[in-house]
From Swiss-Prot:
The keyword Aminoacyl-tRNA synthetase does not apply. It comes from Homo sapiens (Human). It is linked to Dyggve-Melchior-Clausen syndrome: A rare autosomal recessive disorder belonging to the group of spondyloepimetaphyseal dysplasias. DMC is characterized by progressive short stature with short trunk dwarfism, microcephaly, protruding sternum, and psychomotor retardation. Radiological features include a platyspondyly with double vertebral humps, an epiphyso-metaphyseal dysplasia and lacy pelvis iliac crests. Smith-McCort dysplasia 1: A rare autosomal recessive osteochondrodysplasia with skeletal features identical to those of Dyggve-Melchior-Clausen syndrome, but with normal intelligence and no microcephaly. It is characterized by short limbs and trunk with barrel-shaped chest. The radiographic phenotype includes platyspondyly, generalized abnormalities of the epiphyses and metaphyses, and a distinctive lacy appearance of the iliac crest. It holds the Pfam family Dymeclin. Keywords: Cytoplasm, Disease variant, Dwarfism, Golgi apparatus, Lipoprotein, Membrane, Myristate. It comes from the Eukaryota. It is a lipid-anchor. Belongs to the dymeclin family. The lineage of its organism: Eukaryota, Metazoa, Chordata, Craniata, Vertebrata. This is Dymeclin. Necessary for correct organization of Golgi apparatus. Involved in bone development. A lipid is attached at G2 (N-myristoyl glycine).
Length: 669
């Protein structure tokens, strides 16, 4: 490091880093700091270069860990950074590139060191290294400062208060990255942490007042999707004597190591990811999700979650109840637009889920929108490409649909939105289809994919619950959607017969076998019968509540009427089959009266006429199908590993050795 450009491989031999980590105590006023902080790196573009940086940092850290208790150099470095941040706002206003660049470099070094410290030492050791004591001869005072707390407060101030300009973009990203790194102790524990330094510093004390401002800033960073300044946008003149501070291209700021603007981390998934258009937005979103999913402290709820649960629209002029802490307002229209545009990433989908599930103001606002297709279509596209998505992303997309379908207004309005030419739907050309029919098609496709591949009962349950919530409001179903409902039932029926046959053979075999354990076909049969009953309830709900709106479903039902024969007398389905049987019988007799060789158009005409003639009181009333999403007990056991896997795979310019990760299983090394 120091005044010339550096290569990562040379870091352990760098004289400035050797001095920082050595045995000599360096005063915070020493000119050394100006020399140390005047460096630029060629930007690493791969996980192997990030790994190289990590290894180089570990080498420096070993020496620092050994000597810092005597030298206090880490504390001095932090003090240098803290003193500089006090002038940062003024420097931004005065366009003081060099000052901002050096301040950024100080934070970059702190972040690299902190990352290794957190991975390799206990919280107690970590806090000792970040406790600053003034070292002077003959001074044995026990007064000390907690620099970790000061650093975190300073980072929160920096993130929330420094104006976002080309020259401050990098330091804003670095401040957010450093907070992510501070919270990363969770990565190195198998169990979810319920008491940690994160809880100690971020949920009480001087950091607490920044809660709402931080959450608001991170949300606005996500909304704005600010792109980084172009490389080489700022050029510092070199000093003619070649001594002192040689800056070369200011890409100290723009092409530095910290501007690795591709998805960081390792593993095949990350390597294949596209470049990020806004590292600041990505990093902000990841930090927001980590904060929102921290467990409650023993004596206080998570304030970041409280802020996320309670913020309101800037258009809402009603006062906040005094009981709501950390309240703030944000532009819901801008947030909605960003959420619609960013649904290609796991983390944006997880944010949408979090807001819909936890913030009733947002949920009410979204459900009142007249352009819901902008939100629903990206979610359907996630489900449509289920083969390319990880299971967590699919779950989040499904749960979002389930939450939306809890609202009757949503279930009605989606059938009124007509879409043209859905290019990503490749099974069939859909020149015109309602959003409701498309939603049904995609959910049924997800169920069929799950039946043949993953066989995940949880996935089935959520898909069927969403269809059930919608069923009473089905309107003008597209003929293809109606066909797919019945063809799914056909698939389930075949599966039922197959499992029933296997169960029968298994029972015969068990009578003649010598205590050989047999598959539990009874359980399989029970699961498939639950799903079949749910499908029958969905069909029944549509026929009972909106028969006159759905001639295509009646047509599909009549076309495959033989499918339902075996379930008429089945004890598990007799009750729910009554209405379906009645509809089939009623319309079959009408078609019979009309004669043979009927065209599709003529059959539909007879159905439409028959709907008017069918006495509604002959259809038995059933309780309305209504399913509500409820988070399972201890949701943090699912969400915390998920969020950190997203950080691991998607954080900008942050690398963790996969062998050190304890929280989740690695897909690949």
């Amino acid at each position: 490091m120091g005044s010339n450009s550096s290569r990562i491989g040379d870091l352990p031999k760098n004289e400035y880093l050797k001095k920082l980590s050595g045995t000599e105590s360096i005063s915070e006023n020493d000119p050394f700091w100006n020399q140390l902080l005047s460096f630029s790196f060629p930007a690493p573009t791969s996980s192997s270069e990030l790994k190289l940086l990590e290894e180089a940092t570990i080498s420096v850290c070993r020496s620092l860990v050994e000597n810092n208790p005597r030298t206090g150099n880490l504390g001095a470095l932090i003090k240098v950074f803290l003193s500089r941040t006090k002038e940062l706002k003024l420097s931004a206003e005065c366009q003081n590139h060099i000052f901002i660049w050096q301040t950024h470099n100080a934070l970059f070094i702190i972040c690299c060191l902190l990352k290794v410290f957190i991975c390799q030492m206990s919280e107690e050791e970590l806090q000792l290294h970040f406790t600053y004591e003034e070292k002077s001869p003959g001074n044995y005072s026990s007064d000390s400062e907690d620099l970790l707390e000061e650093l975190l407060c300073c980072l929160m101030q920096l993130i929330t208060d420094i104006p976002l300009l080309d020259i401050t973009y990098e330091i804003s990203v670095e401040a957010i990255s450093t907070m992510v790194v501070f919270l990363s102790c969770q990565l190195f524990h198998k169990e979810v942490l319920r008491q940690s330094i994160s809880h100690k510093y971020l949920m009480r004390g001087p950091c607490l007042p920044y809660t709402s401002k931080l959450v608001k800033t991170l949300l606005y960073n996500f909304i704005r999707q600010e792109k980084p300044p172009p490389p080489g946008a700022h050029v510092f003149p070199q000093q003619s004597d070649g001594g002192g501070l040689l800056y070369g291209l200011a890409s100290g700021v723009a092409t530095g190591l910290w501007t690795v603007f591709t998805l960081g981390g390792v593993g095949s998934k990350a390597a294949a990811s596209p470049e990020l258009s806004s590292p600041l937005a990505n990093q902000s979103l990841l930090l927001l999700l980590v904060l929102a999913n921290l467990t409650d402290a023993s004596d206080a709820p998570n304030p970041y979650r409280q802020a996320i649960m309670s913020f309101k629209n800037t258009q809402d002029s009603s006062p906040f109840p005094s009981s709501i802490p950390h309240a703030f307002q944000i532009n819901f229209n801008s947030l909605y637009t960003a959420l619609c545009e960013q649904q290609t990433s796991d983390q944006a989908t997880l944010l949408l889920y979090t807001l819909l599930h936890q913030n009733s103001n947002i949920r009410t606002y979204m459900l009142a929108r007249t352009d819901m297709e902008n939100l629903v279509l990206p979610i359907l596209e996630i489900l449509y490409h289920v083969e390319e998505r990880n299971s967590h992303h699919v779950y989040m997309a499904l749960i979002i649909l389930l939450i939306l379908t809890e609202d009757d207004g949503f279930n009605r309005s989606i059938h009124e939105v007509i879409l043209k030419n859905i290019t990503w739907y490749s099974e069939r050309v859909l020149t015109e289809i309602s959003l409701g029919s498309l939603l049904i098609l995609v959910v049924i496709r997800t169920i069929q994919y799950n039946m043949t591949r993953t066989r995940d009962k949880y996935l089935h349950t959520n898909c069927l619950a969403a269809l059930a919530n919608m069923s009473a409001q089905f309107r003008s179903l597209h003929q293809y959607a109606a066909q797919r409902i019945i063809s799914l039932f056909s698939l389930l029926s075949k599966k039922h017969n197959k499992v029933l046959e296997q169960a029968t053979q298994s029972l015969r075999g068990s009578l003649s076998s010598n205590d050989v354990p047999l598959p539990d076909y009874a359980q399989d049969l029970n699961v498939i019968e639950e799903v079949i009953r749910m499908m029958l309830e969905i069909i029944n709900s549509c026929l009972t509540n909106s028969l006159h709106h759905n001639p295509n479903l009646v047509y599909a039902l009549l076309y495959k009427r033989d499918l339902f024969e075996q379930f008429r007398t089945h004890p598990s389905f007799q009750d729910i089959m009554q209405n379906i049987d009645l509809v089939i019988s009623f319309f079959s007799s009408r078609l019979l009266q009309a004669g043979a060789e009927l065209s599709v158009e003529r059959v539909l005409e007879i159905i439409k006429q028959g709907v008017v003639a069918l006495p509604k009181d002959r259809l038995k009333k059933f309780p309305e199908l209504k399913f509500k999403y409820v988070e399972e007990e201890q949701p943090e056991e699912f969400f915390i590993p998920y969020v950190w896997s997203l950080v691991y795979n998607s954080a900008v310019g942050l690398y963790w050795n996969p062998q050190d990760i304890q929280l989740f299983t690695m897909d690949s090394d």
